[in-house]
Design a protein with these regions (language model features):
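Structural preference for solvent-exposed beta-strand-turn elements
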Residues: 1-142
Length: 142
């Protein structure tokens, strides 16, 4: 078995920059829908899933301003539609994040089932059970 052997004895000093985590950022972005306040979210990874989710959110009326590659300013006060287009959702698995946020704020969400995954089947049945347990009526259509 390989191992690292580290001999200390010297004080450590310096800085480490930690980049944002994609899955945490997806949930945080969706949660920002819940408030009508303007929200600044920093330390976002610059990856496809984040960018597609932001596009999907813009398509339903969320105002998104890219401040830097890793920061956005968002305002969800003017969401005009709770139906997210399949063209966005087929590219990512994060659609279920939007379901919870839209249900929480508007008591309704029309969101296609998630796509974007080559890992294999990862159903969202536990999310659906949770929505039902909280009183939502869930209808799955083809």
């Amino acid at each position: 078995m390989e191992q690292y052997i580290i001999r200390g004895g010297n004080p450590l000093a310096g800085e480490v920059e930690i980049s944002g985590a994609k899955n945490a950022a997806l949930g945080i972005l969706a949660a920002a829908i819940m408030t009508d306040e303007t929200v600044l979210i920093e330390n976002l990874p610059d990856v496809r899933d984040i960018n597609v989710l932001l596009e999907a959110m813009e398509s339903i009326g969320v105002k998104v301003e890219r401040i830097t590659r890793h920061a956005v300013m968002m305002n969800s006060a003017q969401i005009g539609d709770v139906s997210v287009d399949y063209e966005y959702i087929k590219r990512i698995r994060a659609s279920y994040y939007l379901i919870g946020a839209l249900l929480g704020k508007y008591k309704k969400a029309v969101v296609p089932l998630p796509g974007g995954c080559n890992i294999g089947s990862r159903p969202i049945d536990l999310h659906i059970k949770g929505f039902k347990a909280l009183g939502a009526k869930v209808e799955i259509r083809n």
